[in-house]
């Protein structure tokens, strides 16, 4: 929006402005919009996903590192369990130290066992994801190969049909092909006036009729028979 119509609170006066003591000098008035605003060039940072940077990145390794960091953060935020009773002062026995007779499916697991179980489950999930990815890639490759093979077969079929339809001898051998017609089509200029003018015009006697051709007219025929032949 323009500010040209707004009033000036401090109009410019020659030689009487700020820092102007000489009346012979021209008055100078500056605005904040006249000052340079962008004095530095902005460069692309390393974290702005440049094409070269994206090509050189290992997304699988970064994903695995983020998963491990998230697991460590989750384990760090988990509150430690403190037991006030005298029976729970000592640490819980490990799973391998518990006799087989005392094992029960309802017994809770320790923190270390829980961490090991989570790491194993994460590894299993990663392996399952990679296997699913390889399966999808293989299915897409097979689908692409099948489509290319079908396209080649269709092109070959069309080419053979064109070859067979272009040869009339081969068309006659096919029972499903319609009977070919070798009759010569009548030309469009068969009944024009100036075609074969002197061919067989005197063999038969015809009734007098008007012909728009001086060489085929009755007067010309009589004149040629009388004075030329």
From Swiss-Prot:
Residues 104-126 have a biased composition (Acidic residues). This is Spliceosome-associated protein CWC15 homolog. GO terms for cellular component: catalytic step 2 spliceosome; mitochondrion; nuclear speck; nucleoplasm; nucleus; Prp19 complex; spliceosomal complex; U2-type catalytic step 2 spliceosome. Keywords: Acetylation, Coiled coil, mRNA processing, mRNA splicing, Nucleus, Phosphoprotein, Spliceosome. Belongs to the CWC15 family. The modification N-acetylthreonine is found at residue 2. Involved in pre-mRNA splicing as component of the spliceosome. Component of the PRP19-CDC5L complex that forms an integral part of the spliceosome and is required for activating pre-mRNA splicing. As a component of the minor spliceosome, involved in the splicing of U12-type introns in pre-mRNAs.
